[in-house]
Curated annotation (Swiss-Prot):
Official protein name in the record: Vacuolar protein sorting/targeting protein 10
Swiss-Prot/TrEMBL BNR repeat ranges: 450-460, 496-507, 792-801, 846-856, 1136-1146, 1177-1187
Lumenal compartment residues: 22-1394
Family that this chain belongs to: Belongs to the VPS10-related sortilin family.
Taxonomic source organism: Candida albicans (strain WO-1)
Protein origin, superkingdom: Eukaryota
Database matches in CDD domains: Sialidase_non-viral (cd15482)
Transmembrane segments: 1395-1415
Keyword Signal carried by entry: yes
Amino acid sequence: MRNNWNWLIFLVPFILSLTTAYTPDISVVKNKSPAREIKYFDDSSNLLVLRDEHLLISKNDGKSFEEIPDIKDPIIYFEMDPTNKNRAFAMTLSQKQYITEDQGNKWRTFEIDIFNGEMASIPKITFNFENPNYLMISNYECPEGQRLNRNCKHRYFFTKDGFKSKPNKLPVDAHVCRFAKSTKTSKIGKSETIFCTVNQLNSYGHIVESHLYNSNDFFQNKNEIKIKPLDSSSGEIIDVKIEEDFMIVVSRMDKFNEKSLINAYVSRDGENFVRADLDIDIKYGVMSFLPSSVSSLFLTIMDFNSRAFQTASFYGSDSSGLHFTKLLDNVAGGNIQKIENIDGAWIANIGVDSNNPYDGDESLLDNLFGGTYAKSIVSKVSINDGKDWSLIKLNDNSCKIEDECSLHLWDFTELDGEGKFVTGPTPGILLGVGNKGKNLAHEFEKMKTYVSRDGGVTWNKALDFPAVFAFGDQGNVILAVPYNGKKKYEAAKHFYFSLDQGKSWEKVDLEHPIYPLSILTTIDGTSRKFIIGGIDDSRRAENEYIYSVDFTNAFDGKTCGDDDFEEFVARKSNDNGNDEPLCVYGHREKFRRRKQDAKCFVNKLFEDIKVIEDPCQCTEHDFECGPGFRLSEKESTNVCVPDRKQLTQLCQSKSEITLPNKVLVEGNKCNMGDKKLEDFVSQETLKCSDYVDNGGDGNGDEKNPNQGDSNQIEVHINDFEGKLSQYQYIAESKDNNAADNVVIKTMDDRLWISNNGGVSFVRVPISDKILGFYAGPIPGQITLITATNIIYVSDDGGATFIKRKVPTQPSPRVDRAIAFHSKNVERFIWFGEECESNGRCTSNAYITDDAGATFNKLMANVRTCDYVGAVLESGDHELIYCSGQNSLDNNNNNNKNKNKLALFSLKESSSEEPKKIFENIVGYAITGTYVVVATIDDKTDSLLSKVTVDGDIFADADFPHDLKVEPHQAFTVLDSSSKAVFMHVTTNEKPNFEYGQLLKSNSNGTYFVLTLDNVNRNTVGYVDFDKIDGLEGTIIANVVANAQANEGTKNLQTLISHNDGSEWDKLVPPTIDSEGIKYPCTGQSLNKCALHLHGFTERADYRDTFSSGSATGFLIGVGNVGEFLTPMDDPSTATFLSTDGGVTWKEIKKGVYMWEYGDQGTILVLVNAVENTDVLYYSLDEGQTWKEYKFSEYKVNIYDLATVPTDTARKFIIFAENPKDHRDIQTFTIDFTNIYPRQCQLNLDDPEHDDYEYWSPTHPIGGDKCIFGHESKYLRRAKGHTDCFIGSAPLSEGYKLEKNCSCTRRDYECDYNYVRDVNDNTCKLVKGMTSADRKTTMCSKENAFQYFESTGYRKIPLSTCKGGQQFDNWNPKPCPGKEKQFNEYYGREVKGHKLFFLIFIPLIIFLATVLFVYDRGIRRNGGFKRLGQIRLNDDDDDFNPIENDQIDVVVNKIVKGGVYTVAVLIATVKTIRKIDRMMLEKLGNVIFRRSPGRRNYVSVPNDLDEEEELFGDYQDNLDDELEDAVFNQDDNLVRTPFADDVEEEEEEREGEGEGEQSNPSDERLFDIDDNEDEDEQHEVNKPTTS
């Protein structure tokens, strides 16, 4: 029995050992604040922690931390040296920095002059992998008070001895510097080779030149590297990268646009660079290089078009690094990761269209990816370097890929000891957080933790919750801490660990629950010690706890033997039952790893995992296309075809060339076996003439350097189902060059969007029927309208849409469904229809200030509403106007005005009822900063116009006296960009014979004058009126020449005005046509033979205009030369071009063509608008020469030709009918981006030596350059510089106002109620009106108290002229009986306190002053009797006044001055009396030559001495006095001195010389009559002799 108990005692410890789980050793350290950074030294137990600017060290894997006694200064950051595992750097904000070379045990200082001013960036250290003692340290130094910008200087310092001596400044002002040996595998240059880019800036901050240099002696000497076609004056080098053994130079194509496309130039030797064929719109800041190999470069291109859902494209290159292939699109958030240690293995999250992407609450994933907005996320894996992707297989019978179920991972990385996120340094063991299903779940709490043991090909569930994790001992120890996300705010109370590669897990309690911030172990993942860092669950403080977890004693520390290991072969897909591993780079990879259930550890601390490589048999996949070849887009197999772009360069000066079509991928390790190289590669001989563009016209002509290389033009074709219904460019930002988003709606209610200028389109995944879309005034704003009460709102140019529910369906009674706020994207007004049970419907307005999340009813029975306060320069910014039913009470059926349209005003944030402004209106229009309201006067039954500039006070907009506008007459507000409102009033409404008067207002929009009569309009109210963009005051209009006929066919003629409608002329026709044949216009007047253009009313797309705002002075139009405009289909119709603002024209093509401008006019494109075609014509030299380009393999019917509204892009879209199905459309995107080899050089500091020249518009009459009173100079690309593009060059900064000119007739237009007489170019009163009528009209207005006596002219608001001829003389006069109001208005009425201040205050001051002077200066000094002693000679007088202080001195001087003044006046009077009165009268007659009843003139005498004595030197001011001459007016006529008047004056002066012998140079006539004289103007009398 005793023996049994002995056995029992012996078994108890054994049983307990079986039932009690292993617990690792745990220690914890508490801190008052969380660590900013925590990193391990490589192959060490030492780690550094930065907390509150204190650097701490742990020498025992985080069990305890201690201060570093050698460091006395605050530390802003620290960095481990990747080239030396024992070295680290700690940086301060002083000149003293710290370095350790023994893994943190001891630190020393070094000094560097890097903080001599404001620090704009944290210093960055550049390392050298070949010589670790070669280092560079740099930061940006900015001018005081400025943030990081181009004015900041990047300063580099270098050391050759690892900072043992003080670093020296690199003697170059570099933008970026890199060591050639910046990677372990780099074969470029020497250990001391440095590459630097240097930007030369001008005084405007523009980059003038950008250079790339290298140096082998730290820039004591330097060598410039020339990269063709990258010229130093073209583009901007923005970065230099060393990736593996590739060197990449990244340049911005447009150095003036930070969002410009970029190019990458690749080299393997650092000397010879070739441009990579990244045929994508890469923008700086969104290109990221991923872990690459010697055989390929990998990178992602992030697309930031969507603010809610950011995606990236994944690219891989061939072994040359030059030819890239898109491997994956729509990578969600750029989340793609290379699996460590396994070549060719990648995991990525991909955004896919969701069946219901807009429903559901926002979650953590939504914040990270934007999941609720547009996309669902699925995870995929590739094991052949991205060539093929597959869903991730889960070893779960309830989730099979064939059932649309797979694993989707939110995260599959750990934080390594260096602070980087990696999949883990394990032999194929991975952990990830995600869920099974069709896509990644939005709710974080639904996710679980999964494990893979085959490199990510298949997975198993590990934990029922999401966790952060880390690997130890090559994956044999896994530590995981639960992480519940932001929604479920709960701290982790436990951690879990697995000792069998994730098969089973044990739970361990944490002494202090934490929110985990980091879990890490040694960099190589071989240690069994971990650190868990996190903050506690206290809401009041952020205490940090750092746990040290040690698994060293697990399995009693046993080290594995050979039997405990297995061979793991990577990249086994098991697809189709095939268990063979996939070969990548010509080899298989094997690993020796511990068996899953082995009870031991590898226990090889700080020893990296070893990969066993096994070569494969060579196949087609081990070869790539050779130089001059590219992969075929048509063939699915690995077929290489000649590449025209590459051959253009390779064929220089050659007639034929022989090249291998394929080459073995560099770094590939495949084994030929029984194969030969010829089995995979063939030599091909190519004729260069088949691939090199001769640049001619297609008929064998010699190359024209002005036409570029058409091989650089790219065409992208897209097919759409349904006919074209609507399209529009949407700008992404305020940058004019950023409007790359194109939205297309088809007739079948589908929507397509492109964010690359039309290169590719994506269908918007919305199942609702889309009626249309509206683009708002704010960049990126677009709203989709559906047939239901659902709308979709986007503020990122259509990259993503938010689903919103509106109160009602859109109202068919309102001509638009939505009214946008011009400044706030969150605000808009919705117009919906609400119907009652009896079928009666009303149109209501609803307002939102949260982008449609909520709505409030604004007003019922509306016609339209607008945010007018947002566009007016003054007034209430919350003001809203609505036009609607006069009575707001639907039940008030007795109101006779109920059906009339009224104008109401409301406030956005006010709950007050709408305020009625006008009872009876036709409508209102917003133009510029004016609001014009058309009201009906019920008394006179006439149409009146009211104008406001502040939304509160309305002024009458008075039409000319002879124009009465009936209520039924249409008027159209056309423009207000020139500080005046242009309006067209229809005067003839006969169908198909409509025309009217073009009126122009004064600067405040109150008085309108007739500027052009019989202006053509069409049936729907559009007018042939075009304001020319970019040129002040240039207008083109068509008039009906046979207006009196009133029936039949209109005879249209085209007129142009260069002074904002004041004067009009016909277009001067070209002398010859495009074929060199003369036009029969010689000897004919412009009335009989001129150029006429088809105008606004005949355009299929009203957005197509003659001009471009960016191509200053360029105009293109379709028309003919003759007496009248002929129909479009007339044989005489042709296309014409002007490059000088419409002064001269040339015919460029016979027939009707569509046109577009590109790159601010350096690219002109024409395409046939009538006939089916497969070609377009383009010009790169301002229309001097044209080249044909075939864009399609078949002829198509073209609907439209388009580009960005600013005409600054180099991409054009042709919308055409699909020839395969006439019900569908095609787009051809023609990309000229690469047709220019360089960007034009702009240097405003030295404009004579760049690619631009100044151009000034010239007035066609007189030929001078004074337009609107000033001479302007605009920058344009210089003639002959046709090899460069403009891009975003700020040409406006080079605009010059050369001078202000003297005023001439061209600076004036006719005043209110005056009209220009085309016969003598004078302004006359309108028919039936006199000056008295004008006074009566103006004074009859309500509250009027003044009127103006007009000369008949008023200065054009745009004119800035000075001096010269003054035609306007506005003289305000009081209306009868309104003198008191008039005087009060002008401050002339003196009464009350004003009278007291003007009279009594000065009188009191004067009397007080006199009394004071008398008392101190006269009475005290003896009174007036002593004043007689004061003589003019101060030395002889006997007056010695009392002067006790400075006041006495001043007073006595005043007394003396007064005495002297009185004495001089008395002496002067006495002298004049002595002059003979007869002589004085004679002198007066000679001077004034008076003649009774005649005008009075001043004759300048010949005696210069007398002249100077009487008048001074008159010659200096002669021109000014002549310009001051004024003129009179008749009741109906105002004459002005034009050129013919000057001739008459010269003739009269000749007559004067015959009658009198006088010096003509000294004799001048000055008319000094006032304006009331009614004698005939400019009457000149010969002076009479006295």
